[in-house]
Amino acid sequence: MEAKAIAKYVRMSPRKVGVVLDLVRGKDVNEAFAILNYTPREAAVVINKVLKSAVANAENNLELDPSRLYVAEAYACQGPTLKRYQPHAQGRAFRINKRTSHVTLVVKERE
């Protein structure tokens, strides 16, 4: 049995989120929380929230033992891009892409 949690439209690029997700993929939940608490990146805060939600889903909806859970899947897909323009010299304007991501975490119980 697996429990899933998704955070959509996170205002952070999927590439930056993916770097932190690589740290917790395959780890036990308690170890993943410890890693995220000491990771100095903004994405760690978002992933911590999603992981807490996934553990709560496993505990309440599926009645799984939280001490035996591990991060089975962790990935960030690209969400819609917000396009903004930055004025530059001589009447030019450069486009700035503000990327968003959908963060998904799946936790399973170890056999």
UniProtKB/Swiss-Prot annotation:
GO terms for molecular function: rRNA binding; structural constituent of ribosome. NCBIfam families: rplV_bact (TIGR01044). One of its GO terms (biological process) is translation. This is Large ribosomal subunit protein uL22. PANTHER family: CHLOROPLAST 50S RIBOSOMAL PROTEIN L22-RELATED (PTHR13501), LARGE RIBOSOMAL SUBUNIT PROTEIN UL22M (PTHR13501:SF8). The keyword Isomerase does not apply. Belongs to the universal ribosomal protein uL22 family. The keyword rRNA-binding applies. This protein binds specifically to 23S rRNA; its binding is stimulated by other ribosomal proteins, e.g. L4, L17, and L20. It is important during the early stages of 50S assembly. It makes multiple contacts with different domains of the 23S rRNA in the assembled 50S subunit and ribosome. The globular domain of the protein is located near the polypeptide exit tunnel on the outside of the subunit, while an extended beta-hairpin is found that lines the wall of the exit tunnel in the center of the 70S ribosome. It comes from the Bacteria. It comes from Clostridium tetani (strain Massachusetts / E88). Part of the 50S ribosomal subunit. GO terms for cellular component: cytosolic large ribosomal subunit. Keywords: Ribonucleoprotein, Ribosomal protein, RNA-binding, rRNA-binding.
